[in-house]
From Swiss-Prot:
Assembly description: Toroid-shaped homodecamer, composed of two pentamers of five dimers.
UniProt entry keywords in alphabetical sequence: GTP-binding, Hydrolase, Metal-binding, Nucleotide-binding, One-carbon metabolism, Zinc
GO CC, any one term: cytoplasm
Family: Belongs to the GTP cyclohydrolase I family.
Listed NCBIfam families: folE, PRK09347.1-1, PRK09347.1-3
Name of the coding gene: folE
Catalytic activity: GTP + H2O = 7,8-dihydroneopterin 3'-triphosphate + formate + H(+)
Name this polypeptide is given: GTP cyclohydrolase 1
Residues reported in the UniProt entry to bind Zn(2+): C108, H111, C179
């Protein structure tokens, strides 16, 4: 299936800036990927001395394969990039548009455990306006791949800048990393904040302060 124009533009912009997730060319169909993941997951679970003949575990390798391909890592495939509605700014709206408390769930690429948090996104319209739900869908798309929070924040910024044809975009993410909470240091209270600011949000202290102060 051919990629959408929006997907092609965003992918090219990320490659140009060195912000694309490290990925190899995709040579398998979704079903082929599921079959191969299922096979190797059986090997992993068997090495952990789990009895896959048990009713509770028998279908686990296939369930994991489907979850990886269709859900939590579906953002690795640009065929899944959301359908984007961008319209001309005929009304000349030039004030900040802000969407906050966007839920995000991603996966740490170092240990493949959960990153759970929220995003706040703002932009100042120039020529284009985007459907508000599309902002949430873009966050979700880039969250559904192995990630580091810093790159995820930048990817969402560049995607919106590319689609809206403006640099005036700001992204802030607050998240709990389960590689910190459930293993290693076992810190159950800390969270991580990242920001990516473009255009006037980066160059104008008042605009930057307005965005960051309202994001608390």
């Amino acid at each position: 299936m051919a990629l959408s124009e929006a997907a092609v533009k965003v992918q090219a912009a990320l490659h140009e800036r060195g912000l694309e997730t490290p990925m190899l060319p995709n040579v398998f169909t979704p079903e082929e990927r599921k079959d191969k993941i299922e096979f190797h997951m059986k090997e992993i679970l068997t090495l952990m001395s789990l009895d896959l003949s048990d009713d509770s575990l028998a279908d686990t390798p296939r369930r994991i394969a489907k979850m990886y391909v269709d859900e939590i890592f579906s953002g690795l495939d640009y065929e899944n990039f959301p359908k984007i509605t961008v319209i001309d700014n005929k009304m000349g709206f030039d004030e900040m548009v802000r969407v906050q408390d966007i839920s995000l769930t991603s996966t740490c690429e170092h240990h493949l455990v959960t990153i759970d948090g929220t995003a706040t996104i703002a932009y100042i319209p120039r020529k284009k306006i985007i459907g508000l739900s599309k902002i949430n869908r873009i966050v979700r798309f880039f969250s559904q791949r192995p990630q580091v929070q810093e790159r995820l924040t930048q990817q969402v910024l560049v995607a919106l800048q590319t689609l809206l044809e403006t640099k005036d975009v700001a992204v802030k993410m607050d998240a709990v990393h389960y590689c910190v909470k459930s293993r290693g240091v076992m810190d159950s209270t800390s969270s991580t904040t990242t920001t990516a600011l473009g255009g006037i949000f980066k160059s104008n202290p008042a605009t930057r302060a307005e965005f960051l102060n309202q994001s608390k």
